[in-house]
Amino acid sequence: MTKNKKYSYGTAGFRTKASDLEAAVYSSGVAAALRSMELKGKTIGVMITASHNPVEDNGVKIIDADGGMLAMEWEDKCTQLANAPSKAEFDFLIKQFLTPTTCQPKVIIGYDTRPSSPRLAELLKVCLDEMSASYIDYGYITTPQLHWLVRLINKSTAASFLEEGPPITEYYDTLTSAFSKIDPSMQDSPTVSRVVVDCANGVGSQPLKTVAGLVKDSLSIELVNTDVRASELLNNGCGADFVKTKQSPPLALEGKIKPNQLYASIDGDADRLIFYYINQNRKFHLLDGDKISTALVGYLNILVKKSGMPFSLGVVQTAYANGASTEYLQDLGITTVFTPTGVKHLHKAAKEFDIGVYFEANGHGTVLFSDKALANLAHPFFTPSPVQAAAIEQLQSYSVLINQAIGDAISDLLATISVLNALHWDASAWSNTYKDLPNKLAKVKVSDRTIYKSTDAERRLVSPDGLQEKIDALVAKYEKGRSFVRASGTEDVVRVYAEASTKQAADELCEKVCQLVL
């Protein structure tokens, strides 16, 4: 099946040059059909996208029946299918993974605006036809929208949804209706009444235009970088990854940014969100995933206390979360847990809480409400007072507004702005809730990355022997010092992260830890 190309299915599915992706797309179609059969005909999603990658890349990922990421045991099956050396081996694997059933497999398809996406989607359909699968093609759609639709279909009892699939208008109506119910009094004199959003010239442009039209009476959303026809513009000098990495606005906004106006950038498939602004002195301020997480959980904490509900509420972070954000959460009395890097780890840990919040610093994240929390909000076990009833209603609205399947830049945008208005925070007030510790991230080339083994959510090394003790001794010399070393998952490098009370100290600590690694 494959020639001189090795595929590996990870958190983002398969991702590589679009010209090398055919075998991965075909085998993913087979895997999606097999997974649907294993789940007795539940609907599975297949999304063709490479998110924030350059336009010449593409990818394919499978969305499981709960609307979340593919079950881990199926990641290996996808990898085996994509790397099958012959048709005979491919057919053998299909027989191995096949669950005998009379249920027809069901799949829904979506793709981003890359020029290679429609061609790859057609190949996917050929495969699904060969697997005798029923499928619905949603065309150009954001990754979080497809996750949301899979979850809705499999939770629904509506026959039309199961047979024809819900119209995408369900997504827009659900989000904007919930947004309008969140503290309507704030809409009379909102602190944030306008936001400018950089769409990365990606597939999120049209959905955001639709949302902007539906919420225009309470929020003005101005869109920039919306050209999806000129494919070379995708993620080029724009988008959440560019802004986060460069610590500067998209190139199209250079010199045009107005002081204290709130701006946001999404990525190419609209699952990441970053905010930013410039102050009166034209200094750039980034409001990343840590800042989004702390704002959301801070307000949800207020609502939980007002509601009288005994909900557990917590935030999930990785080692890359800025230490100042962790300290801020601890000062609020909010439980914070750490996991290894990767959305699948964060998502799993967030599900342990009644209300679990997770955001990577890159702006990918969401808020998960447990089934128990949703049941208690719908049917309180006590007679709530007017104040409690209002808080319960607000929490219900957030559980609907925020995508429960996966991180969603569009729903996160609306949720964050509603929180800023509820707290009466403008961009500056939000930024000043805590000051990020200066930090530096570096890469060190090594001959064998596998010897670097970590524990404590990748924050401490257990191998090579004695290296962690040397790092500890260095860190102890710096005020608010912290550093960790983590092996890359894809290349022979280790990543070194360091933070301290000043930029000079953070840079110096990072350099000294890099020297230890060498």
Swiss-Prot record:
It is found in: Cytoplasm; Nucleus. The modification Phosphothreonine is found at residue 49. GO terms for biological process: carbohydrate metabolic process; cell wall organization; chitin biosynthetic process; UDP-N-acetylglucosamine biosynthetic process. It catalyses: N-acetyl-alpha-D-glucosamine 1-phosphate = N-acetyl-D-glucosamine 6-phosphate. Substrate binds at residues 360-362, 486-490, 495. It holds the Pfam family AMG1_II. Pathway: Nucleotide-sugar biosynthesis; UDP-N-acetyl-alpha-D-glucosamine biosynthesis; N-acetyl-alpha-D-glucosamine 1-phosphate from alpha-D-glucosamine 6-phosphate (route I): step 2/2. GO terms for cellular component: cytosol; nucleus. InterPro entries: A-D-PHexomutase_a/b/a-I, A-D-PHexomutase_a/b/a-I/II/III, A-D-PHexomutase_C, A-D-PHexomutase_C_sf, A-D-PHexomutase_CS, AMG1_II, AMG1_III, PAGM. Its main location: cytoplasm. Binds 1 Mg(2+) ion per subunit. Gene3D superfamilies: Alpha-D-Glucose-1,6-Bisphosphate, subunit A, domain 3, Alpha-D-phosphohexomutase, C-terminal domain. It comes from the Eukaryota. Transmembrane segments: none annotated. The keyword Acyltransferase does not apply. CDD domains: PGM3 (cd03086). The modification Phosphoserine is found at residue 51. Mg(2+) binds at residues 51, 267, 269, 271. Keywords: Carbohydrate metabolism, Cell wall biogenesis/degradation, Cytoplasm, Isomerase, Magnesium, Metal-binding, Nucleus, Phosphoprotein. Belongs to the phosphohexose mutase family. This is Phosphoacetylglucosamine mutase 1. The lineage of its organism: Eukaryota, Fungi, Dikarya, Ascomycota, Taphrinomycotina.
